[in-house]
Amino acid sequence: MPVTVVNRIVVTIGIGAVVLFGLGVPTNAQPPPQHGQEQQDKKDAKQQKAQKKQEKQAGREAPHDQQTLVRQQQQRLAQYREHLEQQQRVAEQQSAQLERQHRRAQYRLQQHYLARLQQQQLRIQGQADYDYSRDPYFSTPPSYRYFRGDRYYETNQYGVDLLRQAVNYGYDEGLRTGLADRQDRWESNYRDSFAYRDANYGYGGFYVDRDDYNNYFREGFRRGYEDGYGDRSQYGRFTDGRGTILDAVLASILNVQAIR
């Protein structure tokens, strides 16, 4: 889940208003006139309340402090470890199916993907004693907003860099998958790939929710697959043994806006 910052609104109520509504006023007493500053404070508070309501309706994540972020991160890692174990079993079934279909190029590619995923899983299992106090992500306030569907989320530079990585990793994997299907003379279908359905390669369980990483990985994958299967370079290029999505395409996918 993306990170937001706690915005506490403190409204100063004038002494006259407290006396009038909180303590009661004798019948022969007259409440003091409201000052201009007091009226402005009430107006600001009303605007802040309306803004919070709009943000909630827009689907903005609830704000969290640093300790809450750490607790969420620990829970996220635990759930991710379990998910990766389940994905290993799914991958074994997919590999057996590829062998039955004699899709040799796709089978080799998937085995390579699984080997990298297993290495990633080992690294995540070693995060039990992770020192969150030394990770600047947890003390860096949000500075960017990104949109997904009808919701928007806030994160800092570390989160944006991870989402950018997701798109590029997805493009590279999609490019290779498209090439493999073409070599196997198999019908074009990027959704049939385990890597597309898994979409976890490169995700270490930190900074952004897995659903967000998966979403942007698949966005890159789909475009990479189209380039690979069609033997073209519409969305990216292949240099130094790796596929990289074009900057303009990447920017249109991420749709990131600076907020401060």
Question: Language-model segments: which ranges?
Answer:
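Sec-dependent N-terminal signal peptides
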Residues: 1-31
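Short N-terminal segments immediately surrounding and downstream of signal-peptide cleavage
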Residues: 32-49
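Intrinsic-disorder/low-complexity detector
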Residues: 6, 29-30, 52-60, 64-260
